[in-house]
Protein backbone atom coordinates (compact mmCIF):
# COMPACT_ATOMS: atom_id res chain seq x y z
CA UNK A 1 0.00 0.00 0.00
CA UNK A 2 1.03 3.61 -0.62
CA UNK A 3 -0.14 6.63 1.38
CA UNK A 4 -0.77 10.09 -0.08
CA UNK A 5 -1.04 13.35 1.89
CA UNK A 6 -1.95 16.81 0.61
CA UNK A 7 -2.53 19.97 2.69
CA UNK A 8 -3.59 22.67 0.25
CA UNK A 9 -5.00 26.12 0.96
CA UNK A 10 -8.53 24.87 1.54
CA UNK A 11 -8.59 21.05 1.85
CA UNK A 12 -6.88 18.48 4.06
CA UNK A 13 -6.57 15.24 2.08
CA UNK A 14 -5.30 11.71 2.84
CA UNK A 15 -5.53 8.73 0.46
CA UNK A 16 -4.40 5.12 0.33
CA UNK A 17 -3.84 3.05 -2.84
CA UNK A 18 -2.86 -0.58 -3.23
CA UNK A 19 0.01 -2.07 -5.24
CA UNK A 20 -2.14 -2.09 -8.38
CA UNK A 21 -3.09 1.58 -8.01
CA UNK A 22 -6.61 0.86 -6.82
CA UNK A 23 -7.93 3.56 -4.48
CA UNK A 24 -8.59 2.02 -1.07
CA UNK A 25 -9.37 5.19 0.89
CA UNK A 26 -9.93 8.81 -0.10
CA UNK A 27 -10.66 11.20 2.78
CA UNK A 28 -10.89 14.97 2.52
CA UNK A 29 -11.91 17.79 4.82
CA UNK A 30 -12.62 21.26 3.41
CA UNK A 31 -11.30 23.99 5.68
CA UNK A 32 -14.00 26.24 7.18
CA UNK A 33 -14.22 29.89 6.12
CA UNK A 34 -16.38 32.39 8.02
CA UNK A 35 -19.48 33.60 6.21
CA UNK A 36 -18.78 36.72 4.20
CA UNK A 37 -15.03 36.07 4.12
CA UNK A 38 -13.20 35.31 0.87
CA UNK A 39 -10.50 32.99 2.16
CA UNK A 40 -8.11 32.03 4.95
CA UNK A 41 -4.75 33.33 6.05
CA UNK A 42 -1.94 30.79 5.85
CA UNK A 43 -1.72 30.63 9.64
CA UNK A 44 -5.43 29.84 9.89
CA UNK A 45 -5.24 27.16 7.21
CA UNK A 46 -2.15 25.58 8.79
CA UNK A 47 -3.94 25.36 12.14
CA UNK A 48 -6.95 23.65 10.51
CA UNK A 49 -4.71 21.09 8.78
CA UNK A 50 -3.00 20.26 12.07
CA UNK A 51 -6.41 19.76 13.63
CA UNK A 52 -7.77 17.65 10.73
CA UNK A 53 -4.83 15.34 10.04
CA UNK A 54 -5.04 13.03 13.08
CA UNK A 55 -8.69 12.20 12.43
CA UNK A 56 -8.20 11.73 8.68
CA UNK A 57 -5.10 9.60 9.21
CA UNK A 58 -7.03 7.41 11.65
CA UNK A 59 -9.88 7.06 9.16
CA UNK A 60 -7.53 6.04 6.36
CA UNK A 61 -5.05 3.78 8.14
CA UNK A 62 -6.60 3.10 11.53
CA UNK A 63 -7.77 -0.40 10.59
CA UNK A 64 -4.97 -1.14 8.11
CA UNK A 65 -1.93 -3.29 9.04
CA UNK A 66 0.42 -0.63 7.70
CA UNK A 67 3.53 -1.62 9.65
CA UNK A 68 4.39 -4.35 7.15
CA UNK A 69 2.11 -3.40 4.28
CA UNK A 70 2.87 0.30 3.71
CA UNK A 71 5.64 0.62 1.13
CA UNK A 72 5.89 4.37 0.50
CA UNK A 73 4.42 7.79 1.20
CA UNK A 74 3.81 10.65 -1.22
CA UNK A 75 3.28 14.15 0.14
CA UNK A 76 2.85 17.58 -1.42
CA UNK A 77 5.55 19.88 -0.03
CA UNK A 78 5.01 22.92 -2.26
CA UNK A 79 2.45 24.43 -4.65
CA UNK A 80 4.50 23.82 -7.84
CA UNK A 81 7.43 21.64 -8.93
CA UNK A 82 9.80 24.60 -9.24
CA UNK A 83 12.59 25.97 -7.09
CA UNK A 84 11.53 28.30 -4.25
CA UNK A 85 7.85 27.35 -4.54
CA UNK A 86 6.60 27.48 -0.96
CA UNK A 87 3.51 27.90 1.21
CA UNK A 88 3.38 27.25 4.97
CA UNK A 89 0.26 25.07 4.71
CA UNK A 90 2.27 22.25 3.16
CA UNK A 91 4.42 21.92 6.27
CA UNK A 92 1.52 20.18 8.05
CA UNK A 93 1.46 17.23 5.66
CA UNK A 94 5.23 17.16 5.24
CA UNK A 95 5.74 16.83 8.99
CA UNK A 96 3.35 13.87 9.23
CA UNK A 97 5.05 12.15 6.27
CA UNK A 98 8.53 12.60 7.76
CA UNK A 99 7.47 11.23 11.16
CA UNK A 100 5.68 8.21 9.67
CA UNK A 101 8.54 7.51 7.27
CA UNK A 102 11.05 7.40 10.14
CA UNK A 103 8.75 5.42 12.42
CA UNK A 104 8.04 2.51 10.06
CA UNK A 105 11.13 2.81 7.84
CA UNK A 106 9.55 3.45 4.44
CA UNK A 107 10.59 6.03 1.83
CA UNK A 108 8.62 9.20 1.33
CA UNK A 109 8.53 11.23 -1.86
CA UNK A 110 8.42 15.02 -1.89
CA UNK A 111 5.95 16.11 -4.56
CA UNK A 112 4.06 19.25 -5.44
CA UNK A 113 0.37 20.03 -5.14
CA UNK A 114 0.25 20.76 -8.86
CA UNK A 115 1.77 17.40 -9.81
CA UNK A 116 -0.77 15.69 -7.57
CA UNK A 117 -3.59 17.48 -9.39
CA UNK A 118 -2.28 16.38 -12.78
CA UNK A 119 -1.85 12.74 -11.76
CA UNK A 120 -5.22 12.53 -10.02
CA UNK A 121 -6.90 14.03 -13.08
CA UNK A 122 -5.55 11.10 -15.11
CA UNK A 123 -7.35 8.55 -12.92
CA UNK A 124 -10.68 8.85 -14.66
CA UNK A 125 -11.34 11.29 -17.46
CA UNK A 126 -14.09 12.27 -19.83
CA UNK A 127 -12.32 12.30 -23.20
CA UNK A 128 -13.48 14.25 -26.25
CA UNK A 129 -11.42 13.73 -29.41
CA UNK A 130 -11.35 15.34 -32.82
CA UNK A 131 -9.66 12.98 -35.32
CA UNK A 132 -7.26 11.77 -32.64
CA UNK A 133 -7.10 8.53 -30.68
CA UNK A 134 -5.30 8.39 -27.35
CA UNK A 135 -3.27 5.28 -26.60
CA UNK A 136 -4.77 3.10 -23.87
CA UNK A 137 -1.74 3.78 -21.66
CA UNK A 138 -1.54 7.52 -22.35
CA UNK A 139 -1.24 8.27 -18.61
CA UNK A 140 2.22 6.67 -18.53
CA UNK A 141 3.53 7.95 -21.85
CA UNK A 142 6.34 10.50 -21.99
CA UNK A 143 4.89 12.50 -24.89
CA UNK A 144 4.31 16.13 -23.88
CA UNK A 145 0.81 17.47 -23.39
CA UNK A 146 -0.86 20.63 -22.17
CA UNK A 147 -2.28 20.50 -18.65
CA UNK A 148 -4.75 23.06 -17.34
CA UNK A 149 -4.77 23.76 -13.60
CA UNK A 150 -7.65 26.12 -12.76
CA UNK A 151 -8.42 26.49 -9.06
CA UNK A 152 -8.72 29.07 -6.29
CA UNK A 153 -4.95 29.41 -5.99
CA UNK A 154 -3.75 28.67 -9.52
CA UNK A 155 -4.80 29.49 -13.07
CA UNK A 156 -2.09 28.08 -15.30
CA UNK A 157 -1.66 26.12 -18.50
CA UNK A 158 1.41 23.89 -18.41
CA UNK A 159 3.56 22.14 -20.96
CA UNK A 160 3.99 18.77 -19.24
CA UNK A 161 6.24 15.73 -19.67
CA UNK A 162 6.34 12.63 -17.50
CA UNK A 163 9.45 11.98 -15.41
CA UNK A 164 10.52 9.07 -13.24
CA UNK A 165 9.13 10.96 -10.26
CA UNK A 166 6.31 13.33 -11.06
CA UNK A 167 6.23 15.71 -13.99
CA UNK A 168 8.35 18.32 -15.68
CA UNK A 169 6.08 21.36 -15.89
CA UNK A 170 6.65 24.59 -17.78
CA UNK A 171 4.12 27.41 -17.49
CA UNK A 172 3.08 28.48 -20.99
CA UNK A 173 -0.12 30.35 -20.11
CA UNK A 174 -1.42 31.92 -16.91
CA UNK A 175 -3.65 34.54 -15.35
CA UNK A 176 -1.84 37.83 -14.92
CA UNK A 177 -4.09 38.92 -12.06
CA UNK A 178 -6.94 36.97 -10.40
CA UNK A 179 -7.18 33.18 -10.44
CA UNK A 180 -10.31 31.64 -11.92
CA UNK A 181 -11.41 30.22 -8.56
CA UNK A 182 -10.83 33.58 -6.87
CA UNK A 183 -13.05 35.25 -9.44
CA UNK A 184 -15.84 32.72 -8.94
CA UNK A 185 -15.63 32.88 -5.13
CA UNK A 186 -15.57 36.67 -5.03
CA UNK A 187 -18.71 36.93 -7.16
CA UNK A 188 -20.40 34.18 -5.15
CA UNK A 189 -19.63 35.84 -1.82
CA UNK A 190 -20.85 39.13 -3.30
CA UNK A 191 -24.16 37.37 -3.97
CA UNK A 192 -24.35 36.16 -0.35
CA UNK A 193 -23.06 32.60 -0.88
CA UNK A 194 -20.70 30.76 1.43
CA UNK A 195 -17.03 30.34 0.52
CA UNK A 196 -16.11 28.39 -1.60
CA UNK A 197 -18.99 29.42 -3.85
CA UNK A 198 -18.39 27.47 -7.06
CA UNK A 199 -21.04 24.77 -6.68
CA UNK A 200 -23.73 27.13 -5.40
CA UNK A 201 -23.03 29.56 -8.22
CA UNK A 202 -23.20 26.75 -10.79
CA UNK A 203 -26.56 25.60 -9.42
CA UNK A 204 -27.83 29.16 -9.80
CA UNK A 205 -26.64 29.29 -13.42
CA UNK A 206 -27.50 25.75 -14.55
CA UNK A 207 -31.19 26.29 -15.44
CA UNK A 208 -30.15 28.81 -18.11
CA UNK A 209 -29.30 27.63 -21.59
CA UNK A 210 -28.24 31.06 -22.79
CA UNK A 211 -27.75 34.39 -21.07
CA UNK A 212 -28.39 37.94 -22.30
CA UNK A 213 -25.22 39.10 -20.52
CA UNK A 214 -21.74 38.58 -21.97
CA UNK A 215 -18.52 39.48 -20.14
CA UNK A 216 -15.50 40.53 -22.18
CA UNK A 217 -12.34 38.41 -22.08
CA UNK A 218 -8.70 39.30 -22.64
CA UNK A 219 -6.14 36.74 -23.91
CA UNK A 220 -2.64 37.45 -25.26
CA UNK A 221 -0.30 34.62 -26.35
CA UNK A 222 -1.77 32.13 -23.89
CA UNK A 223 -1.85 34.55 -20.94
CA UNK A 224 -5.11 36.07 -19.75
CA UNK A 225 -6.81 38.42 -17.29
CA UNK A 226 -9.77 37.84 -14.95
CA UNK A 227 -9.87 41.09 -12.95
CA UNK A 228 -11.77 42.84 -15.74
CA UNK A 229 -14.53 40.25 -15.43
CA UNK A 230 -14.83 40.93 -11.72
CA UNK A 231 -15.25 44.67 -12.34
CA UNK A 232 -17.77 44.06 -15.14
CA UNK A 233 -19.73 41.66 -12.92
CA UNK A 234 -19.92 44.22 -10.10
CA UNK A 235 -21.14 46.89 -12.51
CA UNK A 236 -23.78 44.54 -13.91
CA UNK A 237 -25.12 43.82 -10.44
CA UNK A 238 -25.26 47.52 -9.62
CA UNK A 239 -27.32 48.02 -12.78
CA UNK A 240 -29.81 45.38 -11.61
CA UNK A 241 -28.68 42.31 -13.57
CA UNK A 242 -30.31 39.06 -12.46
CA UNK A 243 -27.90 36.94 -10.36
CA UNK A 244 -28.68 33.83 -12.45
CA UNK A 245 -27.76 35.67 -15.65
CA UNK A 246 -24.54 36.89 -14.09
CA UNK A 247 -23.62 33.42 -12.80
CA UNK A 248 -24.02 31.88 -16.24
CA UNK A 249 -22.18 34.73 -17.95
CA UNK A 250 -19.31 34.40 -15.49
CA UNK A 251 -18.72 30.67 -16.15
CA UNK A 252 -19.25 31.13 -19.89
CA UNK A 253 -16.59 33.86 -19.91
CA UNK A 254 -14.10 31.72 -17.94
CA UNK A 255 -14.60 28.85 -20.41
CA UNK A 256 -14.30 31.20 -23.37
CA UNK A 257 -11.07 32.65 -21.94
CA UNK A 258 -9.64 29.18 -21.41
CA UNK A 259 -10.64 28.06 -24.90
CA UNK A 260 -8.96 31.08 -26.49
CA UNK A 261 -5.78 30.53 -24.44
CA UNK A 262 -5.59 26.81 -25.39
CA UNK A 263 -6.04 27.70 -29.06
CA UNK A 264 -3.17 30.21 -28.86
CA UNK A 265 -0.95 27.49 -27.38
CA UNK A 266 -2.01 24.79 -29.85
CA UNK A 267 -0.84 27.14 -32.59
CA UNK A 268 2.62 27.25 -30.99
CA UNK A 269 3.09 23.61 -29.92
CA UNK A 270 2.80 20.12 -31.41
CA UNK A 271 0.84 18.52 -28.56
CA UNK A 272 -2.20 16.41 -29.34
CA UNK A 273 -3.69 16.08 -25.83
CA UNK A 274 -4.91 18.57 -23.24
CA UNK A 275 -5.64 17.53 -19.64
CA UNK A 276 -7.94 19.65 -17.47
CA UNK A 277 -7.69 19.65 -13.65
CA UNK A 278 -8.48 21.86 -10.67
CA UNK A 279 -11.74 22.66 -8.94
CA UNK A 280 -12.93 25.16 -11.57
CA UNK A 281 -12.67 22.44 -14.21
CA UNK A 282 -15.42 20.49 -12.46
CA UNK A 283 -17.84 23.16 -13.75
CA UNK A 284 -19.92 21.91 -16.69
CA UNK A 285 -20.45 25.35 -18.23
CA UNK A 286 -16.72 26.11 -18.25
CA UNK A 287 -15.94 22.70 -19.77
CA UNK A 288 -18.56 22.95 -22.51
CA UNK A 289 -17.59 26.46 -23.57
CA UNK A 290 -13.87 25.60 -23.71
CA UNK A 291 -14.52 22.33 -25.61
CA UNK A 292 -16.83 23.99 -28.13
CA UNK A 293 -14.35 26.75 -28.93
CA UNK A 294 -11.29 24.45 -29.15
CA UNK A 295 -13.02 21.96 -31.44
CA UNK A 296 -14.17 24.76 -33.74
CA UNK A 297 -10.51 25.70 -34.12
CA UNK A 298 -9.47 22.05 -34.68
CA UNK A 299 -12.05 21.57 -37.42
CA UNK A 300 -11.05 24.72 -39.26
CA UNK A 301 -7.32 23.97 -38.98
CA UNK A 302 -7.53 20.18 -39.36
CA UNK A 303 -5.72 19.79 -36.04
CA UNK A 304 -6.25 16.38 -34.32
CA UNK A 305 -6.56 16.71 -30.56
CA UNK A 306 -7.98 14.98 -27.46
CA UNK A 307 -9.42 16.92 -24.55
CA UNK A 308 -9.29 15.00 -21.27
CA UNK A 309 -11.49 16.41 -18.50
CA UNK A 310 -10.97 14.98 -15.01
CA UNK A 311 -14.10 13.59 -13.38
CA UNK A 312 -15.25 16.02 -10.64
CA UNK A 313 -14.02 13.82 -7.76
CA UNK A 314 -10.52 13.88 -9.26
CA UNK A 315 -10.55 17.51 -10.40
CA UNK A 316 -10.76 19.05 -6.93
CA UNK A 317 -8.06 18.97 -4.23
CA UNK A 318 -7.17 15.43 -3.12
CA UNK A 319 -4.24 13.20 -2.07
CA UNK A 320 -4.85 10.46 -4.64
CA UNK A 321 -2.38 11.97 -7.09
CA UNK A 322 0.38 12.07 -4.46
CA UNK A 323 -0.25 8.42 -3.58
CA UNK A 324 -0.13 7.29 -7.21
CA UNK A 325 3.01 9.31 -8.00
CA UNK A 326 4.73 7.83 -4.95
CA UNK A 327 3.68 4.33 -6.06
CA UNK A 328 5.15 4.88 -9.51
CA UNK A 329 8.38 6.41 -8.17
CA UNK A 330 8.79 3.51 -5.73
CA UNK A 331 8.24 0.95 -8.50
CA UNK A 332 10.78 2.67 -10.74
CA UNK A 333 13.37 2.59 -7.96
CA UNK A 334 12.67 -1.08 -7.25
CA UNK A 335 12.98 -1.94 -10.94
CA UNK A 336 16.26 -0.06 -11.22
CA UNK A 337 17.63 -1.82 -8.12
CA UNK A 338 16.75 -5.22 -9.61
CA UNK A 339 18.40 -4.35 -12.92
CA UNK A 340 21.53 -3.13 -11.16
Which residues fall in each region the model found?
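Glycine-rich phosphate-binding/hydrolytic loop that grips phosphoryl groups
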Residues: 117-120, 308-340
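Conserved phosphate-binding/catalytic loops in two-lobed NTP-binding clefts
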Residues: 274, 290-322
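A short helix-loop
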Residues: 7-8, 24-26, 139-143, 149-151, ...
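Conserved phosphate-binding catalytic cores of ATP/NTP-utilizing and phosphoryl-transfer enzymes
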Residues: 106, 110-145, 325
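Short glycine-rich phosphate-binding loop at a beta-alpha junction
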Residues: 67-78, 270-281, 308
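Short beta-strand-loop/turn "lid" adjacent to the catalytic site in phosphate-handling enzymes
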Residues: 61-98, 102
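Short glycine-rich, Thr/Ser-proximal phosphate-binding strand/loop in the N-terminal lobe
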Residues: 8-47, 166-171
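A contiguous, well-structured pocket-lining segment that forms one wall/lid of small-molecule binding clefts
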Residues: 203-274, 280-297, 327-336
Amino acid sequence: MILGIDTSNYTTSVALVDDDGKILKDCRQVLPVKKGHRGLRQSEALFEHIRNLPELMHTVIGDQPIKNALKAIGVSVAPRPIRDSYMPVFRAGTGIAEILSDAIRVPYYRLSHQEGHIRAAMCETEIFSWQHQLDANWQRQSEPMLAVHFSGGTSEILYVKREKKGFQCKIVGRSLDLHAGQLVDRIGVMLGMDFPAGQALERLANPLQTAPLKLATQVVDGDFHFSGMENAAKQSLQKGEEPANLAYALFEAVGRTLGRAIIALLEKTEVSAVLFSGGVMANEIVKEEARKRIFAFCRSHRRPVSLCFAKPQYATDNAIGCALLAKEAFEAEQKKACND
